[in-house]
Amino acid sequence: RQRQMCIRDRLQTVPDIELLNIDKQQSELYPHLTQLADVLDGRKLKELLAGIDLVVLLAAEHKDNVTPTSLYYTVNVEGMCNTLQAMESNGVTRLVFTSSVAVYGLNKDNPSELHPADPFNDYGRSKWEAECLLQEWYDTHREWNINILRPTVIFGEGNRGNVYNLLRQIISGRFLMVGNGENRKSMAYVGNVASFITFLIENKKEGYNVFNYIDKPDFTMNDLVYHVGDVLNKHIPTTHYPYWLGMFG
């Protein structure tokens, strides 16, 4: 949801753009832009996309504790299918879809957009299935413009995800550094992701395009602890614990 807020903020600065926010929940900040609907409600989507020129598809089931796991596929794949059908019914031919680097799987060293998909969990597999659906769609809809964005872990205003929890642990002093701290964490700031989506809308108007998004450099855990302490002017303990001890929690 923080992505939606930042994208709306960014797009409202672009001349000659009128926004419609379609969401399952009413927006506290943008109620005047919001229409309530679910990507699983194809009929409602067809109704709301009348007169629309471009769709940014952010809707996704993404939390780690989703049950049943079939919800990943219901929302992420069937939701994509409903969106495409609603777009086609209304003559909408431009789509920006936020996928994920999760399609590459674990422990890949800076994979390019051409790297083979190797998702390791249901979230990643469902995102890849949604991309495959888009590829098949584009094969028979060559006049469309489809831009796929694969961001890494996103952090920023309004976010209470993994990066937020990590930084909160570091700030609290309860963070235990397991190993030598040289493992790296790739991240993307939500404001930068929103700006890149705006760039795609304004500049990538033809063809089928795929983009990874990561804000470089990747920080080591040692870097993160240092920078958090530096920003807060606070000493953060940096005792390192061996991996075998960390395995016991």
Q: Which residues make up each language-model segment?
A:
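Substrate-positioning beta->alpha
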Residues: 159-165, 179-202, 208-212
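NAD(P)H-binding glycine-rich loop region in Rossmannoid oxidoreductase-like domains
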Residues: 39-78, 82, 86, 104
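Short, small-residue-biased leader/transition segments that mark boundaries at the very start
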Residues: 2-7
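Short alpha-helix in the Rossmann-fold core of NAD(P)-dependent oxidoreductases
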Residues: 73-80, 96-99, 126-127, 186
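Flexible, glycine-rich beta-alpha linker
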Residues: 104-105, 144-165
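Active-site Tyr-X1-5-Lys
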Residues: 120-147
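Mid/C-terminal beta-alpha module of Rossmann-like enzyme folds, strongest
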Residues: 203-249
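Conserved Rossmann-fold NAD(P)-dependent oxidoreductase catalytic core, especially the SDR/UDP-sugar
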Residues: 82-123, 140
